[in-house]
Amino acid sequence: MKRKLIVGFLALCSITTVCPSVYASTEHYTDSSVTGADSGWSDWDANWADTAADFTKVSLTPGADDTQLNFAWYSEKGDSDATPAVHFGTDKDNLETFEGTAGDVDQDLTGDKAYEYNHVTVTGLEPETTYYYTVEKNGQQTDVCEYKTQKTDTAKMLYVGDPQIGASKGQTQNGAELTNESGAANTAAENDGFSWNRTLNTALSENPDVNFVISAGDQVNKTGEAKEEEYASYLSADALKSLPVATTIGNHDSLNPDYSYHFNNPNNTENGKTAAGGDYYYSYGKGLFIVLNTNNYNVAEHQNTIEEAVKAYPDAKWRIVTIHQDIYGSGLDHSDTDGMILRTQLTPVFDANDIDVVLQGHDHTYSRSKMLYGDGQTHGKYEFSLNADGTDYDWDHATNVDTGDQIALAPEEGDTDSQTALDAFHEDNNCYTIEDVEGNTVTDPQGILYMTANSASGSKYYELLSTQQDYVAARSQNWLPSYSVITMTADSFSIDTYQITDDGKAEAIDDTFTIQKSGTDTSADTTDAAETESDDSAN
């Protein structure tokens, strides 16, 4: 049971910052031709045409628990109906064969060539063991790769936000504008893929015992378009041959199915679906990890996923949710508009299911919240709708689900009615209470920690809001790629965050923050939270 602490008076204030109706990056980005001048950029550039054309890179994903590992890859569609296979084991000369399933890739996404996607699950993994594997592509086995499992009683994860390969489009590199065209002409994807690779290499050099990566979404940039060269660049990072990534569906991933082809997520549910897929969950070490597709605004379905996951893994010491949109962030472009659109609905659901930590992305800035829980009041429900052609969302207006009212997020100057409605929307989102705890180590808190990750590739950065919200404990924007390191045991959950300097060094940007559990029963006690939640708050 989470210990309830005395909470001091919280003065709620409306956030009245008006964001532009078209979200735009700043002039800041990570120029790989500069940061990589002495570390491989010339080779990456020389090989870019081949990289962009190779859609068959393998991706690794955590399995349903830490004894499993999931694989996914494309293979060219041929005359044979070979069953997808991964050969895996501790003896290179005697690998066990694991078979899986295959399906057709929508050829609108791949152009002239037809591909199949292949999904295989390997089972029986043990901690601290060296394995080897090969993958069959069109009947040919790939070179042998090494995969090492780490400790599970003390697990270490990298947490990253928005690699968004291709998002540097429009920036200037060596006098030329980076483009987001198809194939090798996508020079933005070339730039961002190199920086993504550099971030992973830097993080792993400092933390070679990482178990896996958690990505808070937007692996790639193009929205609702063919973008295989962006996935090819993302998956070309050398580290990913031996490093699973638990990805989240971001708004740039959401609108076509290639995400679901490239990533073989465990415990896929029918909840929270968009074209890219839906919610999923997995267990690792002492933690239950729940990944929600919050591009789908049906919170009742997300609640179903959380409850299903908790029922499947009731003994997990930690419950961690990953979402893309930052319902408690501090970035200028999203945190007080589309980022917080589900705040009033998700806050009580997270409280009621004893979630410990929520990992977010979307705003390309860094922030760490104070310990937060719901205020127990009834609030409105909000969402966005797809535009007429279904290729993106109408970001200019939030919809009040109960009344149907459209709320302009950037009212015209002098439109007092729209400004009043926007102010009311912001006021309604003051639906939280700040827990009265101090310091960077908290024990048995009632509240939840909300983290927002900056971009791991530096493909795009946003400004921070001019005024720091009262729920934010720390935040930064230094225009550098960043990552966090999570260390999780049975009784502690710690997070450290670093930026990567232009000379490739990892530099801390926040103090270590730790949540401790005292050894008392940490299973969900939903009575109090349920009493404060209205009957329809999760619909």
What is each residue range found by the language model?
Residues 28-248, 254-275, 300-311, 337-353:
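Divalent metal-dependent phosphoesterase catalytic cores across multiple superfamilies
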Residues 217-220, 313-333:
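Short acidic, glycine-rich surface-loop motifs adjacent to enzyme active sites
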Residues 16-32, 539:
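Sec-dependent signal peptide cleavage junction
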Residues 165-169, 220-224, 251-257, 298-300, ...:
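Active-site environment of divalent metal-dependent phosphoester hydrolases
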Residues 116-122, 130-151, 172, 178-186, ...:
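Extended active-site neighborhood of metal-dependent phosphoesterases/phosphodiesterases
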Residues 2-23:
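Sec-dependent N-terminal signal peptides of Gram-positive bacterial secreted proteins and lipoproteins
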Residues 159-161, 212-218, 245-251, 292-293, ...:
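Active-site neighborhood of phospho(di)ester-bond hydrolases with catalytic His/Asp-centered motifs
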Residues 32-35, 522-539:
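Ser/Thr/Gly/Pro-rich low-complexity, disordered linker/stalk segments of secreted
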